[in-house]
Amino acid sequence: MEMFLVAVGFYGIGVLTMLLPHGMQRAAHWLANSAALFGSAVCAYAAGLQLFGGVSPAPLTWGSYSLGCDGWSAVFLLLTGIAGVVTSLYALGYARSYEGSRLRLLGGMWCLFIMSMVLVLLAGDAFSFLLFWEIMAVASFMLVNHESEKRATWNAAYQYLVMTSVGTAAIMIAFLLTGSASEGFSFAAMSKNTLDGSWQHLVFVCAFAGFALKAGLVPLHVWLPKAHPAAPCHVSALMSGVMLKIALYGFGRFMFSFLPAWNYWWCVVVLLAGVVSAFLGVLYAQMETDIKRVLAYSSVENMGVIFAAFGCGMLMKASDSSFYMLGFVATLVHAFNHSIMKVLMFMCAGSIMHGTGSKNLELFGGLARKMPYTAVFAFVGSLALAAIPLTNGFTGEWLVLQSFISLGTSCAGQDIRLWTAVSFIMLGFTGALALGCFVRFFGITFLGRARSEIVEHAHESDKFMLAAMGVASVLVVACGLYPLPVVRAALLALGMPVALDAFGMNLAWAGIGTAVCYKPLLLLALLLVLGALLWLSVKDCFIVEDVTWNCGTYPTQRQQYSATGFSKPVRRAFDYLLKPKRQVTYMRKEHAYFGRQLSYKLEIPDMITEKLYQPLQKHFVSISNFLRRLQQGSVRLYVAYVMVAMMLVLVWGALYK
């Protein structure tokens, strides 16, 4: 525990940089981000020691409050530490673009944000958890609202604050109900609660609603595509890579420790919420032209996949299947891998914005010639998010699909097989859409010809940003080629034995035999051999290079696929879900042979926002307007309100004493 406290001490030093004089902004920037980097490195090392070295730190208690670390929290602390190191290194270069714009506040809040996430994972009681959870919410709100002079940023930040407050209220109710049926509010005491059936259902609903909101599951995701693009890119990377996973940690803590006897419908709700979130998330990501909103909706998709795997594990355990641990292993492996690849892609998005001054896909094209290193790193991240074999994205999603296969084959019952078939089909659609989404993302951005002048003036990022993206890219490839450490960490976190070999992994349980076998290094060797044979077969072929016939015209950049045009087949196929709003304006006729010019405007409204949240907002506004009539400014009227309230309380007490 001492090493975790050292990490918290580093973060505390970074927080104090907010107090430095205004003239020391640059020094505050370097000190805060360096402190975050070293603190995250210590955190990752301490978590790794606990997971792989068998070192179990003694819990730290004072009064009714406690800090501790077990296997479930250690794997998330490892994830937080690694992501914190990479993003803090990136921030050393990227955050300098905010010099003169509250740079001290940015660095201090950055350290407070990471520190609060670490303390949430170390919390050993409900009150400590909720305290650090609220600090995490406030720090992330301040970071999202850093450019508060922009109206869109202000709106996104306050919508995030309102939504996260609602989620916190639900989590608080779940803790209070569980603690009231226990001998205390420590996690150890709450694990021995005496909740009966109906109260267990209520605790599950509150806990799932609160953590699903923080994780960005549909239909509670509406804050995420607005808050992540509004925040600075290194903040977006950590919010998507780590903060969303802490919601998974909290939900898992409730399910494993406080509600170990799972009801069948709980499992179905978690599974379906994950599957629907995955499908709708990637569908909307395919439609976006803002690079950060693409990645934000991709986070909705991947959190959906993660919760679907968790629901699959729950359903197998509730059905007494021997393979239930496979779902939870897939959950942790994909959560860890998604954290690394999403951190990488948000950093690449920041590099693109830093080099071009824009985040509009429609203005890019040919950036690989101006930003070659960023292009390579974005290519690696795109392969991973598209779940291409030999990347870490494939490892996690492959395990998820294997867990669903095990669900369908090891559990009896037509209803379970129905859920399995529906989930498998929707996850298949999700994978295909994710592939198309990131082919579009990389191709439109880095390939082809420049679509605007901003590409001509683009420049590569500085050494800190490139180094951070390089480290993340290496981790993506390394965890794809050699997934053993990640899988082993997941199994150790779940308290399960593991059978691994030097070339891949064999997940086995007593009495079952090998459940899953995957050997990426052998697959790589096979691909290299096939590639060499292909090269030998074509190296002596006669190749003619010539200009393609262009119908007598010189092609321009406007004749390339646009981001909107690339996604049109998908948009047409799911028109009934997306409800696109098109506006076509015809201009005057400029040339006799080429006809009129036209202006095409497309808007894809969020279906959940339009059908659910906007009507709710109207009702709340109506109620608020009615309540305003009660505020007349009269002291005598307010005294009368108090008297009426007291009378009602007395009557209630007399009737129900």
Write out the residue ranges for each language-model feature.
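Hydrophobic transmembrane alpha-helices and their helix-loop junctions in integral membrane proteins
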Residues: 86-129, 139-460
